[in-house]
């Protein structure tokens, strides 16, 4: 949906269901998405486990998320006029080889192709950056380890701090 339609849907739901903004936020951000479709969880790992056990709603939720990620990648590639690399990071990006494969499937025409063995074994490499690009692909595909603690430390270091408002004890 376009942004205009999203606002209309939000307003329609709020007034039709006669709920507060807080209640609508709870529905849209906590009870929808993976949880709403799968009926299992908002955690992709739980959804994947349920899908592997044969839960069709969990499989649908996983497929929908992978499709949405693929669609987003495609829209960014179009907006930027091409890319040099696709980077997978974070929980799903780093640890879910199956999702990476499904997301990149049928993207050869964009120059994106993943090596099946490299992708399946990316987590075993013990490297910060693992390339999973298939031979001959024009766009590099990388799995990059997330170091959230380091990023928080770097961001915190950049925050200007003023101590003029502090009164320190003089014991």
Residue ranges and their predicted role:
Residues 1-8, 164-169:
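Conserved small/polar residues in nucleotide/adenosyl-binding loops
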Residues 3, 32, 92:
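Glycine-rich beta-alpha junction loops
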Residues 3-26:
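A conserved active-site cap/scaffold subdomain adjacent to cofactor or substrate pockets
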Residues 9-13, 47, 73, 153-156:
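Buried hydrophobic packing segments
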Residues 21-25, 37-42, 76-84, 114-120:
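Flexible, glycine/charged-enriched surface loops at secondary-structure junctions
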Residues 26, 33-37, 44-79:
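Adenine-nucleotide phosphate-binding core of ATP-dependent small-molecule kinases
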Residues 59, 63-79, 93-162:
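Internal helix-turn-beta structural module
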Residues 83-91:
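Short glycine-rich phosphate-binding loop at a beta-alpha junction
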